[in-house]
């Protein structure tokens, strides 16, 4: 059964405050998202398995621990998810990066895939899907669907800010997926924005609308 993890680390919460602030400019916003993604990656990789190897220090031989050959994949949901990728790769530079692009069908209002590019060894990798916002949950559910449809068996979802509605949607559709968030906000407004939220993450990351 999937779990929901809310990271209340002081550094994450401090930086998240400035990410939320409407007066934070594009450059600083981008840097802060990158930094928070790195801090969250530190926590999300806490359960990686370790194995012992023998090394030689300048003083003697020793047994030491290394990550046990886990293959990781980072999957940003386009476009805003791109802003979190480099922060994660700072800690796990060997991870492969895929991309999932979705748009909302104007008739059904449901997410539709327009681009999916994944590592060739999908079934062998542990995936982290990243998107700054988990609002209605539609994009997150669709992205997880896309990965599972192509053979992925181990998936985590990571975002900066989530609404209860989005968390519930992911839990209902994919109860096996753990959700990692920096803040769980109050609700969605009538326009589908998270309250208090941070606005449109993609617009603020890239300076475009």
Curated annotation (Swiss-Prot):
Keywords: Allosteric enzyme, Glycosyltransferase, GTP-binding, Magnesium, Nucleotide-binding, Transferase. It is an enzyme of class 2 (transferase). It comes from Geobacillus kaustophilus (strain HTA426). The keyword Disulfide bond does not apply. PANTHER family: ADENINE PHOSPHORIBOSYLTRANSFERASE (PTHR32315), URACIL PHOSPHORIBOSYLTRANSFERASE, CHLOROPLASTIC (PTHR32315:SF4). Pathway: Pyrimidine metabolism; UMP biosynthesis via salvage pathway; UMP from uracil: step 1/1. Signal peptide: none annotated. It comes from the Bacteria. InterPro entries: PRibTrfase_dom, PRTase-like, Upp_B, UPRTase/APRTase, Ura_phspho_trans. The gene is upp. Pfam families: UPRTase. GO terms for molecular function: GTP binding; magnesium ion binding; uracil phosphoribosyltransferase activity. Its EC number is 2.4.2.9. This is Uracil phosphoribosyltransferase. Catalyzes the conversion of uracil and 5-phospho-alpha-D-ribose 1-diphosphate (PRPP) to UMP and diphosphate. Its cofactor is Mg(2+).
